[in-house]
């Protein structure tokens, strides 16, 4: 038999990795929070921090997405990542961290107690109230235009959420002018939603003239918007958003948790509360003081059901680099990112834009009916897609701007108490 001679070829692992993507992954380096072991590097340690990754040029934005079915370690990862980041980045040679957590289910209280975070519970008739129209650090006259735009975008999103439709051109324009009028009034440097409803009910001549309508005619045209905003001031949300903020945010503390669990089982109310609370936090975090801030938005999928709310969230994401804020969104299923809309709709396209502004994706196991969405939305190859459906508890597929890791997340003994979300299921 004639022997076949094949020319010898020598190549690097970088070339081989293009043939089989999981071969000899180099890892992301050691800078950041230690999270566990990277199974693609032979079990070496895995560390990550979105701000460090941004500074190294690994990503162009510090935002993160965490997705996974319940009970597979998603919540434990978020909590341990937060606790370790606050512990590590607290020395003289590091940039200090500050965290804000939107907690729809009330499950972050043990973590808050462990870290010394302030817990603020919002509930009807309670003593804590936030004003979504707060100026915060944007109260500087030089930033008035940005503040007015933010307020107008927020209120349009809130009204659209209640009305289940986008505002018509007249409503949109009149709303913006009403906010502009309030924002320019010295006695109302911090206008409230109640103030805005009052202007919509009795439009000043300056607003009515701009739309070429008599004030009483304009008031009737804005009735639906006024009723929509009043939903935030009455009934199940009474006392939560109907006046000036009663909460003092201490920038020298470690952070805060907004407990929204009282409205968790009311989907419509929770969407409004999440949106209003997110707006208040975004304004509160808009400080150029050199501190890196992490905003955690649990159950973020609830804000992706309408174009206005999705656009507002995307605008917040885009501002992250300006103020040193990393947004961490938590969802269950990757299909949530389609904004509960058919492919091709404007809302779905905006949600895809939001995903593009989130370059760090931490993916715990997804059910088989979610794998096609994962492949399509995240650009996973066949090997990664198959792996995503077979990950065990505590193990996640990481995608960092095209880089891949499979990480076994580790929980230290001292962290188990604030990671346990199954206490109500045990006798």
Language model features with spans:
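P-loop NTPase motor core of the ASCE superfamily
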Residues: 143-191, 342-427
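Basic- and hydrophobic-enriched, low-structure N-terminal and domain-boundary segments
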Residues: 1-67, 414, 426
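Walker A/P-loop NTP-binding active-site region of P-loop NTPases
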Residues: 72-137, 175
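Conserved beta-strand scaffold positions in the cores of enzyme catalytic domains, especially
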Residues: 45, 101, 119-121, 255-257, ...
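Short helix/loop capping segments that flank catalytic or ligand/cofactor-binding pockets
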Residues: 46, 56-58, 75, 110, ...
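Conserved P-loop NTPase motor cores
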Residues: 52, 59-72, 77-82, 96, ...
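Short, well-ordered loop/turn elements at secondary-structure boundaries
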Residues: 29-30, 41-43, 60-61, 81, ...
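P-loop NTPase motor domains
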Residues: 17-40, 109-117, 132-325, 387, ...
